[in-house]
């Protein structure tokens, strides 16, 4: 009995050791990835120290041993474009691998902007795209001042399809298609971008040595407690600002709400939305809330259908109402304003569109050369650039501590 128990325990211990020694790969080395052609390619990961690791790719084996820190790496020789192929790393099997050209795309919001945000101009092209030879991976957002990460969970490769195309970086989407047309080899896009990020945030500690002020900031943010304090402080300041704006907005609390059709706005100023004749005091931009009202004529046939209200882009945030009913909002300046208007809201004849525009600092504005209209497919009613205008609440510029 003791012999059997010892045998069972030995088997369990061996199984436990085998499972613990399992090789691990970073998320970006996964199904559907693209490897760079005609260059040596590194495959890496983690395992228990001393673990034997064998990579098999295109019928060739490459072996190594995990080091004292558990890390291992093998280098594949230069390869011609092609695929799809399979790869095994010990007991891990990766499928649908291509060899072609891999491009790193990086930057701020212009690179991060998705193809789904440019469907106004490229709807048909994006809706019909299918090319399994183009692959895309977006590096998840995150920061860590304690050193580079070994892995980035969530960095998953996707092929170009009509379902995935809207998730691609718009710039990278058109670039990848052009490169494939020129080369006819698989294209892999690695998008590592973060809107509004500073170049210093992407620099290593070594690279910052020549910039004492930025290096000092980096040293400050090396403290988890300091970063948390800054984040809490910024969030608290924003809450105070938002609360003060809400309480001080005459359009929300001064009798009839300014989004209501029954409000008498005859004493409101009439302004051109693209001019500088509104939103200023003594020649300087006014932060806070700005209210705009415009009446739009809709036919009986149009009123019986759901519409899309397009309001270009605005600086900074907005809430939009049709006939006093909320239809949508956006919290920052860059996205196109595209709001669905149910058929039940619209009526034949005059319909009131109201915009409550919030400006955090600098000049509030509507971006010109964008669509401003009610649309039912190709049937549209353009909005005038002339609106009734009233300042709701003047505020100091909103600032963040970080």
Give the predicted meaning of each segment.
Residues 22, 28-101:
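Ser/Thr-rich low-complexity repeats and stalk/linker segments
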Residues 27-31, 286-299, 337:
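Short beta-strands within extracellular/lumenal beta-sheet-rich domains
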Residues 44, 268, 296-324, 353:
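Aromatic-lined ligand-binding clefts that engage carbohydrates, nucleic acids, or primary amines
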Residues 59-82, 313, 321-371:
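Beta-strand-rich ligand-recognition modules
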Residues 152-191, 196-198, 302, 307, ...:
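A conserved hydrophobic secondary-structure block that centers on an alpha-helix together
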Residues 281-291, 328-334:
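Extracellular beta-rich ligand/substrate-recognition surface
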């Amino acid at each position: 009995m003791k012999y059997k128990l010892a045998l069972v325990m030995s088997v369990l211990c061996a199984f436990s050791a085998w499972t613990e020694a399992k090789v691990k790969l970073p998320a970006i080395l996964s199904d559907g990835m693209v490897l760079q052609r005609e260059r040596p390619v590194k495959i890496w990961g983690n395992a228990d120290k001393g673990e034997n690791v064998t990579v098999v790719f295109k019928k060739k084996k490459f072996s190594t041993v995990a080091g004292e820190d558990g890390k291992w790496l093998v280098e594949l020789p230069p390869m011609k474009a092609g695929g799809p192929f399979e790869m095994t790393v010990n007991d891990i099997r990766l499928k649908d691998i291509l060899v072609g050209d891999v491009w790193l795309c990086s930057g701020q919001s212009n690179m991060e902007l998705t193809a789904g945000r440019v469907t106004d101009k490229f709807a048909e092209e994006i809706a019909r795209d299918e090319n399994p030879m183009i692959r895309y991976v977006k590096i998840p957002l995150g920061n860590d001042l304690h050193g580079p990460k070994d892995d980035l969970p969530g960095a998953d490769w996707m092929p170009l399809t009509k379902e995935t195309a809207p998730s691609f970086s718009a710039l990278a989407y058109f670039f990848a298609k052009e490169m494939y047309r020129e080369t006819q080899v698989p294209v892999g896009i690695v998008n590592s971008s973060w809107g509004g990020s500073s170049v210093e945030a992407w620099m290593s500690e070594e690279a910052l040595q020549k910039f004492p002020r930025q290096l000092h900031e980096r040293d400050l943010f090396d403290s988890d407690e300091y970063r948390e304090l800054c984040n809490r402080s910024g969030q608290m300041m924003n809450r105070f600002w938002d609360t003060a704006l809400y309480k001080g907005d005459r359009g929300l609390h001064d009798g009839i709400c300014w989004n209501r059709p029954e409000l008498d706005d005859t004493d409101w100023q009439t302004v051109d939305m693209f001019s500088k004749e509104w939103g200023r005091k003594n020649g300087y931009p006014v932060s806070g809330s700005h209210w705009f009202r415009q009446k739009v004529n809709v036919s009986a046939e149009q009123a019986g259908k759901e519409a899309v209200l397009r309001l270009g882009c605005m600086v900074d945030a907005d809430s939009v109402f049709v006939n006093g009913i909320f239809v949508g909002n956006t919290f920052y300046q860059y996205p196109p304003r595209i709001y669905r208007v149910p058929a039940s809201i619209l009526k034949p004849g005059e319909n009131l569109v109201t915009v409550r525009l919030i400006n955090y600092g600098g000049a509030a504005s509507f971006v010109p050369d964008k669509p401003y209209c009610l649309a039912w497919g190709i049937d549209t009613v353009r909005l005038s650039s002339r609106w009734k205008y009233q300042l709701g609440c003047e505020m100091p510029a909103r600032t963040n501590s970080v």
